[in-house]
Amino acid sequence: MKILKITGVPEHFNYPWVKVVESQPFLDRGTRLEWIEESRGSGQMNKALRANETDLAIVLTESFLKDFEAGNPSKIIGFHVNSPLVWGIHMHAQSQINSLKELKEHNFLISRIGSGSHLMSLVLAERENWDAEKLSFSVIDNLPGALQAMDATNPELFLWEKYTTKPWVDRVELKRIGEVPSPWPCFVIVATKASLDKFGVLIMELRNLIYDFSQKLQTDPATVETIAREYNLQETDVRDWLNQTKWATNERVSMTQLGQSMEHMKRLGILNSKPEPADFLTVQNLTLTD
């Protein structure tokens, strides 16, 4: 029996993966799916892809493209979420700071270098006209690490998906002082070269099962209640999140949008240059559009 390992963050975006893996659709073909939760985010998943510790990973777009440029040989087999990710801008709940304009220095808690929490600070700096060269970063691994590291007297910012942190904001364990959306589709499905060689077309069949499941979720009236229960979220929050979220439901990739996204990443310093799409996309398994 072959084991196909899939890694993603333990967040509501990945509910389609959790359910498809539970169904084990390829047992009769000698392949068992294994879902691995990685709370430390995209930077850690890029590391796992490089080390062949996972076969697939659901990674933030900007984080994978930066790591690809740095030598990660894995490839994007499709998008998972086509809409932007809305990042909450958080501080210690008892901090006296209530707005970004009150900050004199711009210090960030991040899961790791190259993660979304790191790279989105550059997006925020551009929006707020901060000097990106003067940003400082402390690595804290994940959300629990941020909660432990925060100090009410030290105004450090922590960027994390808005609805994932909402329960802590509601309990006044975190303070959210703003939001910043990613300027591009947020999640890509990435496969290692070894997994593409080992599993072949089955990986694309799995991707298409995810697309089918995601399509059903977006039209199923029970989705709000189901995701709220699975991830301990309020139904009103899930409903708001679903209204601004668009899961990918097919293998199409807009080359215009991708090009504009990479140009923006280059301007921010996330990328040094725009890589050729044929180098990081499995173009033979995708439908490329204008």
Q: Which residues does each PLM region occupy?
A:
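Short, surface-exposed recognition loops or helix-turn segments adjacent to catalytic cores
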Residues: 135-143
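Short polybasic/polar patches that bind polyanions
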Residues: 27, 68, 126, 170, ...
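Secondary-structure end/capping motifs
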Residues: 198-272
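Short, glycine-/small- and polar/acidic-enriched structural segments
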Residues: 2-130, 137, 156-162, 174-181
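Pocket-lining segment of extracytoplasmic ligand-binding domains
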Residues: 142-228
